[in-house]
């Protein structure tokens, strides 16, 4: 009897605790309502626009501002930096049955097409353009010449096509038109000019160039990713065959220069055209030629090029952002996406083989030819750091866990699994098993609260249906709520000044809820996209801090201000 009473009491306590803790869908619902209320348009009386601020102080409701060098303030509303939120709004409607959230996302898309699409099709968004929510006027840092730029943004084209197919197609054509400087040789650039007349586009002639040919435009993969993704979606939704031809052609440009022995690379398929001379190693303008060759060439020879630098940050673009995007396209495009899957999984296997240190869960900094740069001391100033800087191995974090887990669901390869398993173990998730479902011993007491880990576990669960992975995902989800849900917003640290409305914690929680309900299609696949704003920012002393990024403002705690970055 006593045992029964204790059991009953324990059950009642658990029931009360459960009742006192809102479920994850309720939490996301509360969060989204807070975003729509506090980050909304408070400036236009009875006729507010549907637009949103990028950031908000959860405690006061103050919306995050950009301060221009001339002292003007603007409430930052950059639609390219709200694309995860758009996916959250649609997913929340799908799971809750409340259509108002999806309708708000649709209204935001429609408003941008109506008010901020130029004659060439480009939108006012991206790294150097945004809308001031107070005035509704387009803004941008003047020193960047107000150019168009997307880097790993991955706009929610599925939503955009559903709202206005023609306007979305116009944007994608205009995007390629502005960023491909020379179609014949595939010279691309991260910067595109607004208002350009549309050229031949997909009908343009093309001649394959040798790896790392010299161009003025810089073929950074983070910019190429968005071009590849957009043209592929244009093919998917508008059946423009030429768009897919050019999307795959561009993707292949980053594959052809891979090192023939290792299969590693590349971050760029061109090198900067040398147009001027300098004796100042600290001046890293691309007009002086390839910046890796300037800094590493005397010691490592002609293969030391920017495209071959397998360093922290660059490898995230190649083996996380690009990998997730192309793996998804490969699935979506069926037979037409087979090459994308092969290129991506081949690259991930090469990176696993040559770069991953399982003993301490790090990646080696390398040249694409396999030269290990671990603990290398820079002999001169340059693009990759000041003289004396030591290049160190860097942690294999949960974003890499996600790309390797997702790749394994496409290609069950032992090398891919080895890396996913090793990262999971190092990230406190326990033992994923010698294979999915075999020798599994996950840690259901984990303190891991990383949404990337949650997404990775959901990928493994969807592919294997091993319940342990879903249980572990639920634990990570609980940790996210208990540690990152602060004052009605999600923040990595509770003392941050501003909450980012595009943060991915609610996205991960919605994906978890969808998996638990066996409705994974209700939430858009996670691609690890994110927009940004960058430019000159006025400091408190009146000086201009060049190349300031919005994420630096999001990292400030209450009472902190930006410190000089000493960039020129």
Curated annotation (Swiss-Prot):
Signal peptide annotation: 1-19
Cellular-component GO terms for this entry: periplasmic space
Gene, per the UniProt record: pelB
Pathway terms, separated by semicolons: Glycan metabolism; pectin degradation; 2-dehydro-3-deoxy-D-gluconate from pectin: step 2/5
Listed EC numbers: 4.2.2.2
One protein family per Pfam: Pectate_lyase_2
Catalytic activity: Eliminative cleavage of (1->4)-alpha-D-galacturonan to give oligosaccharides with 4-deoxy-alpha-D-galact-4-enuronosyl groups at their non-reducing ends
Superkingdom as given in the UniProt entry: Bacteria
Compartments, as annotated in UniProt: Periplasm
GO biological process: pectin catabolic process
Record GO terms (molecular function): pectate lyase activity
Family listed: Belongs to the polysaccharide lyase 2 family.
Keyword tags: Lyase, Periplasm, Signal
Record carries keyword Lyase: yes
Name the UniProt record assigns to this protein: Periplasmic pectate lyase
Enzyme class: lyase
């Amino acid at each position: 009897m006593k045992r029964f009473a204790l059991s009953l009491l324990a059950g009642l306590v658990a029931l009360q605790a459960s009742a006192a803790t809102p479920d994850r869908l309720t939490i996301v619902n509360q969060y989204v309502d807070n975003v729509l209320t506090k980050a909304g348009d408070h400036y236009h009386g009875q006729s507010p626009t549907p637009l949103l601020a990028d950031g908000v102080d959860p405690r006061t409701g103050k919306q995050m501002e950009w301060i221009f060098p001339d002292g003007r303030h603007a409430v930052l509303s950059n639609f390219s930096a709200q694309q995860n939120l758009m996916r959250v709004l649609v997913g929340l409607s799908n799971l809750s049955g409340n259509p108002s959230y999806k309708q708000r996302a649709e209204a935001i898309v429609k408003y941008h097409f109506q008010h901020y699409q130029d004659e060439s099709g480009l939108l006012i968004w991206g790294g150097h353009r945004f809308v001031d929510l107070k005035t509704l006027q387009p803004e941008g840092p003047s020193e960047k010449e107000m150019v168009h730029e997307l880097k790993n943004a991955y706009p929610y084209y599925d939503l955009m096509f559903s709202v206005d197919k023609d306007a979305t197609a116009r944007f994608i054509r205009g995007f390629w038109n502005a960023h491909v400087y020379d179609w014949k040789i595939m010279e691309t650039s991260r910067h595109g000019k607004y208002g350009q007349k549309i050229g031949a586009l997909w009908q343009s002639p093309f001649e394959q160039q040798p790896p790392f040919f010299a161009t003025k435009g810089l073929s950074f993969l983070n910019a190429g990713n968005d071009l590849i993704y957009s043209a592929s979606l244009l093919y998917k939704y508008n059946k423009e065959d030429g768009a897919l031809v050019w999307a795959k052609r561009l993707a292949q440009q980053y594959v052809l220069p891979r090192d023939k022995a290792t299969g590693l690379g590349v971050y760029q398929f061109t090198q900067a055209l040398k147009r001027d001379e300098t004796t100042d190693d600290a001046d890293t303008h691309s007009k002086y030629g390839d910046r890796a060759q300037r800094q590493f060439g005397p010691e490592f020879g002609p293969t030391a090029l920017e495209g071959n630098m397998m360093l922290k940050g660059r490898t995230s673009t190649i083996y996380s952002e690009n990998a997730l995007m192309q793996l998804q396209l490969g699935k979506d495009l069926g037979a037409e996406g087979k090459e994308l899957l092969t290129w991506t999984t081949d690259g991930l296997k090469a990176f696993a083989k040559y770069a991953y240190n399982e003993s301490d869960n790090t990646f080696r900094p390398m040249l694409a030819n396999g030269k290990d740069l671990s603990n290398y001391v820079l002999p001169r100033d340059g693009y990759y750091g000041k003289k004396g800087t030591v290049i160190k191995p860097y942690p294999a974090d949960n974003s890499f866990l996600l790309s390797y887990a997702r790749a394994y669901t496409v290609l069950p390869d032992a090398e891919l699994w080895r890396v996913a398993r090793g990262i999971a173990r190092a990230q406190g998730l326990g033992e994923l098993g010698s294979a999915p479902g075999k020798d599994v011993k996950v840690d259901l007491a984990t303190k891991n609260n990383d949404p990337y880990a949650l997404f990775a576990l959901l990928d493994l669960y969807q592919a294997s249906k091993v319940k342990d992975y879903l249980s572990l995902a639920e634990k990570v989800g609980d940790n996210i709520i208990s540690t990152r849900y602060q004052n009605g917003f999600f923040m990595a640290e509770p003392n941050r000044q501003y909450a980012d409305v595009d943060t991915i914690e609610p996205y991960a929680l919605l994906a978890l809820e969808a998996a638990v309900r066996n409705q994974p299609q209700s939430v858009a696949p996670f691609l690890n996209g994110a927009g940004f704003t960058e430019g000159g920012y006025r400091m408190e002393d009146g000086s201009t801090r060049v190349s300031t990024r919005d994420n630096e403002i999001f990292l400030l705690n209450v009472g902190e201000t930006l410190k000089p970055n000493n960039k020129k």
